[in-house]
Amino acid sequence: MVQDTISDLFIRLKNASHARLERVEGIPYGKYQEEILKVLVREGYIKGYEIEEKEGKKYLSVQLKFGPGKQPVLNEVRLISVPSRRIYAKKNDIPKVMNGLGIAILTTSAGVLSDAEARQKGVGGQIICYVW
C-alpha cells in the first residue's frame, strides 16, 4: 500500500514521460489525484485522463503529451509539500516556477489550482509541487 499517493502519481507520470510512454495505467484513484490531473490538462502538460474500474476498484489512466521529436512536455516534477512537511504561500507570495516557464500546483480554499489561477482568484494555499 502506497502511503503518499500524490508522490506516487508524480513519480509514475515522470518515469513514463522519460520512457516516452503514451499512456500510464493502473494509478489508484483518488479525488485529490483527479483534481491534480485536471490542472495538468488545463495547463497543457498531459492530453487527458480516464477513470477505469477493475474488480470494483477505480483506477486512473493518463495520456501523456509529447512535443516535436517525441520530447516529453512534462520534464520534471518537484514535490514541495510532503506529509511530514507542509509548505504554504500567501496570495502575494506564490512563487513563479522557472521564471514563468513552469507551474506550481496549490491546494486552496477554491480547490486545486495552478499558480496563475490562484493569483487570478486572489487565494493562497499549500504548494503541492512545481512542474516544468
Curated annotation (Swiss-Prot):
InterPro entries: Ribosomal_uS8, Ribosomal_uS8_CS, Ribosomal_uS8_sf. GO terms for cellular component: ribonucleoprotein complex; ribosome. GO terms for molecular function: rRNA binding; structural constituent of ribosome. It comes from the Bacteria. GO terms for biological process: translation. SUPFAM superfamilies: Ribosomal protein S8 (SSF56047). The keyword Magnesium does not apply. Pfam families: Ribosomal_S8 (PF00410). Keywords: Ribonucleoprotein, Ribosomal protein, RNA-binding, rRNA-binding. Disulfide bonds: none annotated. Part of the 30S ribosomal subunit. Contacts proteins S5 and S12. Belongs to the universal ribosomal protein uS8 family. NCBIfam families: PRK00136.1. One of the primary rRNA binding proteins, it binds directly to 16S rRNA central domain where it helps coordinate assembly of the platform of the 30S subunit. This is Small ribosomal subunit protein uS8. It comes from Coprothermobacter proteolyticus (strain ATCC 35245 / DSM 5265 / OCM 4 / BT).
